[in-house]
Amino acid sequence: MAVFEGTYQVLGTPRFGIVISRFNDLITTKLLEGCQDCLRRHGVDPNPHGSQVDYAWVPGSFEIPLVAAQLAATRRYAAIICLGAVIRGQTPHFDYVAAEVTKGIATASMQTGVPIIYGILTTDTMQQALERAGIKSNKGWEYALNALEMANLMQTLPSAINPPTTKLSSSTRILTDG
């Protein structure tokens, strides 16, 4: 029986994509800083003018899955990290956005086979978001660590001869053999 587990070691010179929401940028820029710090400390150069990390800024969290899917479809990235903050307000808007972003990121990852890290804070208050973006800890660091581990794991997993494809049918994912 085999056991597969990723490490935080960078194999080769992997390229990462980071998709960041401008909405709630007080939070998302702090998440980005934590993410960049983690990547740097693990041997990845986060310089936007370098060759290891590409950045895509989008208007809000709702737009993140589309851009993440497009980046992943290029097969240029070992992993994509999505950074956003959805904070509950007085309307049901929070529920719709949080649910669709979650589904969209999961679908994009399954369809492309590229690890797409869910780095979307969903909090009830701005204070909770601030605590997770640097006051108490920085979740951006954790999201980058997840990306490193998943990139490494995907490199070590055996390749499938005929990998399953994901098809969408009535918003339900169905795995098929062809």
UniProtKB/Swiss-Prot annotation:
Chain sites annotated for binding 5-amino-6-(D-ribitylamino)uracil: F23, S61, F62, E63, A85, V86, I87, Y118
Family, similarity comment: Belongs to the DMRL synthase family.
GO biological-process terms attached to the record: riboflavin biosynthetic process
Keyword terms, alphabetized: Riboflavin biosynthesis, Transferase
GO annotations of cellular component type: cytosol; riboflavin synthase complex
Pathway terms, separated by semicolons: Cofactor biosynthesis; riboflavin biosynthesis; riboflavin from 2-hydroxy-3-oxobutyl phosphate and 5-amino-6-(D-ribitylamino)uracil: step 1/2
Keyword Transferase belongs to the record: yes
Reaction catalyzed: (2S)-2-hydroxy-3-oxobutyl phosphate + 5-amino-6-(D-ribitylamino)uracil = 6,7-dimethyl-8-(1-D-ribityl)lumazine + phosphate + 2 H2O + H(+)
GO molecular function: 6,7-dimethyl-8-ribityllumazine synthase activity
PANTHER family given in the database record: 6,7-DIMETHYL-8-RIBITYLLUMAZINE SYNTHASE, 6,7-DIMETHYL-8-RIBITYLLUMAZINE SYNTHASE DMRL SYNTHASE LUMAZINE SYNTHASE
Transmembrane intervals: none
Residues reported to bind (2S)-2-hydroxy-3-oxobutyl phosphate: Q90, T91, R132
EC number: 2.5.1.78
List of catalytic residues: H93
Protein name, per record: 6,7-dimethyl-8-ribityllumazine synthase
Function, as annotated: Catalyzes the formation of 6,7-dimethyl-8-ribityllumazine by condensation of 5-amino-6-(D-ribitylamino)uracil with 3,4-dihydroxy-2-butanone 4-phosphate. This is the penultimate step in the biosynthesis of riboflavin.
SUPFAM superfamilies for this protein: Lumazine synthase
Pfam families (alphabetical): DMRL_synthase
HAMAP family in the record: Lumazine_synth (MF_00178)
Highest taxon above the source species: Bacteria
Lineage: Bacteria, Bacillati, Cyanobacteriota, Cyanophyceae, Acaryochloridales
